[in-house]
């Protein structure tokens, strides 16, 4: 079944979850991106269960936050964080477009990658350490949202190179069906989040959309289009910024009213 092969390709490429090994046939790759957000659903499910079980067992806020910070990296294998680090090095180099693309391919991590990843994990740890039941559900769902937006970019943005991971998937993908599937994911996730908290949903989605717009502008201006590393950069940045916006908004609401409404 071709759709099942597409599912295995998506999970084998973008996660550490063990799946049956399949040949990367073009017919299967056409729909692989359609299943990319499902990896976010797995991460979000494990994230929320860890939050719930951690508090049930009274593990303490620090240990729970450490576990929640680790889960996206452990399940994804760090592929998106690798792109974030490479992009930070390239952006911070202030070099030409061609030189930035070369830096993205460099397997070594520079000082800016290390510094910015440290700041990222510090902020992420702080963000998950103050989660409540409502915000934990919203942020768990955002693992799907970030991947749906990333999937849209893969088929809709121009690529910086004619080769590479994003170019390979874009050339093979059925753009119309991938776009429709990403929109469906977004609609379902937004409806789900609205049932939890309309205010936090609006705040989180507006932040995610701003990150998406910024991603396109940065990719086109500094690199001439998107790449696999830039896609990873957007994904982890979107999850962090949306998460911070959600917990800050929640804190303002609780502080201002004294209760949830």
Curated annotation (Swiss-Prot):
Cofactor(s) for this UniProt protein: Mg(2+)
Enzyme kind, highest EC tier: transferase
GO molecular function (one): cobalamin 5'-phosphate synthase activity
Lineage: superkingdom: Bacteria
Keyword tags: Cell membrane, Cobalamin biosynthesis, Magnesium, Membrane, Transferase, Transmembrane, Transmembrane helix
InterPro entries according to UniProt: CobS
Residue ranges crossing the lipid bilayer per the database entry: 31-51, 59-79, 125-145, 183-203, 240-260
Annotated catalysed reactions: alpha-ribazole + adenosylcob(III)inamide-GDP = adenosylcob(III)alamin + GMP + H(+); alpha-ribazole 5'-phosphate + adenosylcob(III)inamide-GDP = adenosylcob(III)alamin 5'-phosphate + GMP + H(+)
HAMAP family, alphabetized: CobS
Primary role: Joins adenosylcobinamide-GDP and alpha-ribazole to generate adenosylcobalamin (Ado-cobalamin). Also synthesizes adenosylcobalamin 5'-phosphate from adenosylcobinamide-GDP and alpha-ribazole 5'-phosphate.
Protein name per Swiss-Prot or TrEMBL: Adenosylcobinamide-GDP ribazoletransferase
Organism from which the protein derives: Lachnoclostridium phytofermentans (strain ATCC 700394 / DSM 18823 / ISDg) (Clostridium phytofermentans)
